[in-house]
Amino acid sequence: MMTTHKQVNIYTDGSCLGNPGPGGYGIVMQYKQHSKEIADGFALTTNNRMELLAPIIALEALMEPCIVTLTSDSQYMRQGITQWIHGWKKKGWMTSNKQAVKNVDLWKRLDSVSQRHNIDWRWVKGHTGHKQNERCDKLARDAAEAKPKQIDTGYQESL
């Protein structure tokens, strides 16, 4: 008997007040009629780190391999995971101009957690009224504005 994987829709966004500064991420996950929201904040981080951490946390929350449609307004995250990452891995996590890949800790985590799922990475233009993207944006901003105390150790170690 063939098992069918669950189809899950995930929407993510990251926010940073100042860049670097306090930051947060927002996630909306939908499966059939169920919906779950996740958000968290960090005392000092960057917008790109929050844009990467959101899909990591969302995918890590899935208890089994799923068919995922993941929608984000971050071209950086989407292009990184669908295009740039292949070259980075071949070059030992270096860019084409021999620089260390920024946020490599998160890129490695995203690469790893992506392997167990079948993911359609989609991009949506931010701040254009896309319901779930707007909700993620609010969750992320609220988390960043809540004076978060949590330390983004990956960011601190890169300084």
Swiss-Prot record:
Q: Function of this protein?
A: Endonuclease that specifically degrades the RNA of RNA-DNA hybrids.
Q: Which GO terms describe its biological process?
A: DNA replication, removal of RNA primer
Query: Which EC numbers characterise this protein's activity in its record?
Result: 3.1.26.4
What is the protein named? Ribonuclease H
**Which Gene Ontology terms cover its molecular function?**
magnesium ion binding; nucleic acid binding; RNA-DNA hybrid ribonuclease activity
Family statement: Belongs to the RNase H family.
According to its UniProt record, which cofactors does this protein need?
Mg(2+)
